[in-house]
């Protein structure tokens, strides 16, 4: 665990995929796996897999491979999944409701505690027993409750304003679904999910193949 310093973002981005495949192996009651076997499943080279894991410690044994249960636990710990994160959703429309209804996040330790929206037709509705609150009450809520992650699902014109409210109230993680790049202070971490950009990438790949 001492090797977590100066890990490249490319390696960090691959960790969730390792975690997902290791969960699948656990469900299938696989006890151990070699880097070569994992390579066939995950699509990275065996050398890349070994290099990635070596960034964090010596997980495998030569001639044995990796103990799946132990490796899964190690990756979970590296990803911070042994902790619990308090989350709120900003925007109770289609995307916000879809995220709220996806219970996989809670299994990973991300607990949804509140949903906010500006639309009076949505305020008061319940999603999985969580009542949508008026977004005008957001700042007061943040002063009274510790929140780790803000999930932004509002239109682009409102996203930065909402983000500013979150960051000045000590929210350190922003998961942004609004189609805009947010400005955040140092020490705040953002992950953007720009759905249209992914679709345009897919469009390019299909168009390139046709040519």
From Swiss-Prot:
Matches recorded under SUPFAM superfamilies: NAD(P)-binding Rossmann-fold domains (SSF51735), Winged helix' DNA-binding domain (SSF46785)
Gene Ontology MF annotations: DNA binding; DNA-binding transcription factor activity
Primary localization: cytoplasm
SMART domains linked: CoA_binding
Gene3D superfamilies: NAD(P)-binding Rossmann-like Domain (3.40.50.720), Winged helix-like DNA-binding domain superfamily/Winged helix DNA-binding domain (1.10.10.10)
This protein's UniProt keywords: Cytoplasm, DNA-binding, NAD, Repressor, Transcription, Transcription regulation
Localization terms from the record: Cytoplasm
One of the GO biological process terms: negative regulation of DNA-templated transcription
InterPro entries for the chain: CoA-bd (IPR003781), NAD(P)-bd_dom_sf (IPR036291), Rex_DNA-bd_C_dom (IPR009718), Tscrpt_rep_Rex (IPR022876), WH-like_DNA-bd_sf (IPR036388), WH_DNA-bd_sf (IPR036390)
Pfam families xref list: CoA_binding, Put_DNA-bind_N
GO cellular component: cytoplasm
DNA-binding region: 17-56
Signal peptide: none
Residues given in the record as NAD(+) binding sites: 91-96
Lineage: superkingdom: Bacteria
Subunit text: Homodimer.
Homology family: Belongs to the transcriptional regulatory Rex family.
Function: Modulates transcription in response to changes in cellular NADH/NAD(+) redox state.
PANTHER family reported in the protein's UniProt record: REDOX-SENSING TRANSCRIPTIONAL REPRESSOR REX, REDOX-SENSING TRANSCRIPTIONAL REPRESSOR REX 1
Name of this protein: Redox-sensing transcriptional repressor Rex
Species this chain originates from: Clostridium tetani (strain Massachusetts / E88)
Gene of this entry: rex
């Amino acid at each position: 665990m001492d090797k977590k310093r100066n890990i490249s973002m490319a390696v960090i981005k691959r960790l969730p995929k390792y975690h997902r495949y290791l969960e699948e192996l656990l469900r299938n009651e696989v006890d151990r796996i070699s880097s070569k076997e994992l390579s066939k499943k995950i699509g990275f080279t065996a050398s890349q897999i070994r290099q990635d894991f070596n960034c964090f410690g010596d997980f495998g044994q030569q001639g044995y491979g990796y103990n799946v249960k132990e490796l899964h636990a190690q990756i979970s710990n590296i990803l911070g999944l042994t902790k619990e994160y308090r989350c709120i959703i900003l925007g109770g429309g289609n995307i916000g409701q879809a995220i709220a209804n996806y219970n996989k996040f809670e299994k990973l330790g991300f607990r949804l505690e509140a949903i906010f929206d500006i639309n009076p037709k949505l305020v008061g509705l319940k999603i999985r027993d969580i009542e949508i609150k008026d977004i005008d009450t957001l700042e007061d809520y943040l002063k009274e409750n510790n929140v780790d992650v803000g999930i932004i699902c509002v239109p682009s014109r409102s996203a930065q304003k909402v983000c500013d409210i979150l960051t000045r109230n000590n929210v350190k993680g922003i998961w942004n679904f609004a189609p805009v790049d947010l400005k955040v202070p140092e020490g705040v971490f953002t992950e953007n999910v720009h759905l249209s950009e992914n679709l345009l990438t897919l469009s390019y790949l299909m168009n390139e193949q046709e040519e």
